[in-house]
Amino acid sequence: MLKNINPTQTQAWKALTAHFESAQDMDMKELFAQDAKRFESFSTRFGSDILVDYSKNLIDAETMQHLFALANETEVKSAIEAMFGGDAINKTEGRSVLHTALRNRSDKPVMVDGKDVMPAVNAVLAKMELFTHRIVSGEWKGYTGKEITDVVNIGIGGSDLGPYMVTEALTPYKTRLNMHFVSNVDGTHIVETLKPLNPETTLFLVASKTFTTQETMTNAHSARDWFLAEAGDSAHVAKHFAALSTNAASVAEFGIDTDNMFEFWDWVGGRYSLWSAIGLSISLSIGFDNFAELLDGAHEMDNHFASTEFESNIPVILALIGVWYNNFHGAESEAILPYDQYMHRFAAYFQQGNMESNGKFVDREGNPVEYQTGPIIWGEPGTNGQHAFYQLIHQGTKLIPSDFIAPAISHNPASDHHQKLMSNFFAQTEALAFGKTKETVEAEFLAAGKTAEEVAELVPFKVFEGNRPTNSILVKQINPRSLGNLIAMYEHKIFVQGVIWNIFSFDQWGVELGKQLANQILPELADDAQVTSHDSSTNGLINAFKALKA
């Protein structure tokens, strides 16, 4: 079980607070000038294919020493052991947290309540493999005898974000199937997705553990109505729908053959579920062998995380640097910036992964915390972001630590595109770290023939202060295994930060109140009667909505 340790009461936190007083004056130019081996000292490799360079941060050896001490004092090691050991560390829901078991590629048992879960995990994987083969090979036929050509995954949150992110990131590995994802209860999403599709060749995956999720089931029923408008006979539903669920009764009532129901367990959190049956869309998209490679990659990072000393432990290092900025420098957000167009949903995926996990205001004893917890996560692929929001990162008043991620080898080596992309990748972190001084700007202007008056007027706007922190994560190539490495790396980073902040990272009660109120409001929208049961603003909005749609 996780211990209740207020990080601000630790000796390491107090030492970091004192250290920060002098560290505020750190200058990256000086840090690099003073240490010719700074890159070697503050970078590490994962295997032979991933390099993590954290040298362009406002840290020195003393900073890291205090941060590692903080990890020790908050008992991160015992927390890691508790998670991998199947302890019910999701205390508010009384559940173990074992997404790591889903990608356990060893022969080691994983125990929950005295029972090894691995036989069940491997049975579902075997079922997914067979199903994937039947669909991709064309053996599975629709109700008119045609092969499936399109797969629509209907889910929301973890049942959508993860599979969508991975299938996009691994597009170069796709099978012949066309993948589609529907999540929003806005009817536009399902209607526009279905417009070009043929009911005879479309398979739907309904991803809902309980088979009661409002958004998912609303979309699933609309998909079934669309299908039956063409197919007619409800018996045909079984050839075109499968379920990722544990509610066999509701699945059968919907018309799905329970032989095509793929289960997962309550120790699998939604935002960590792509490794489970929820990943069936991934398996169909890239083939089961590649899905297994994705699991292998995550398992490699799990082993690294569980067994490596903190000083060389990549998720721990990244987590601690994040704590340094969040709790001492006052940074409120972090950017994730993949220089790979296929990874265009990577930041959005970890926006959920991080903000739903660590967006908490009470500690593990239920008391309000007096320090900052999870940051805001955002980002877009490079180079698009450079022409959108990098201005603020470079010259704004907010400190925004940023992760730059890029592959050395492109899947599309057209002309010199990748060299140009990577030149921007390297240039941005250099510019953020070292900036451009007033003197350099003046010299450039004078060399360009500007007058003294022009120089004096324009120089302040051209100065880059630098000292903007970044991590650079260089990957040989984005493939199923390396993507598995990266996803697990960020998952474990988030976990470590939650341990240090003394919060529960695996529940998400913050999503409940809005759903509860929506269920109360829904019947009130059924007629034109004036609503008076809420506050004046909500009443006014509902009544204005009714008037506008009349």
From Swiss-Prot:
Q: Where does it reside? A: Cytoplasm
- Quote the pathway field: Carbohydrate biosynthesis; gluconeogenesis; Carbohydrate degradation; glycolysis; D-glyceraldehyde 3-phosphate and glycerone phosphate from D-glucose: step 2/4
This enzyme catalyses: alpha-D-glucose 6-phosphate = beta-D-fructose 6-phosphate
**Xref: InterPro entries:** G6P_Isomerase, G6P_Isomerase_C, Phosphoglucose_isomerase_CS, SIS_dom_sf, SIS_PGI_1, SIS_PGI_2
Q: Which UniProt keywords apply?
A: Cytoplasm, Gluconeogenesis, Glycolysis, Isomerase
Q: Which residues form the active site?
A: 356, 387, 515
Where in this chain does the entry annotate a coiled-coil region?
Answer: none
Sorted alphabetically, which Gene3D superfamilies does this protein's record hold? 1.10.1390.10, Glucose-6-phosphate isomerase like protein, domain 1
**Keyword match Cytoplasm:** yes
Q: What biological processes does GO assign it?
A: gluconeogenesis; glucose 6-phosphate metabolic process; glycolytic process
Q: Which GO terms describe its cellular component?
A: cytosol
Q: What is its EC number?
A: 5.3.1.9
Q: Name one GO molecular function term.
A: monosaccharide binding
What family classification does the UniProt entry report for this protein? Belongs to the GPI family.
Chain's role:
Catalyzes the reversible isomerization of glucose-6-phosphate to fructose-6-phosphate.
Which protein is depicted?
A: Glucose-6-phosphate isomerase
Which species does the entry assign this protein to? Vibrio atlanticus (strain LGP32) (Vibrio splendidus (strain Mel32))
Mind giving the lineage of the organism this protein is from?
Bacteria, Pseudomonadati, Pseudomonadota, Gammaproteobacteria, Vibrionales
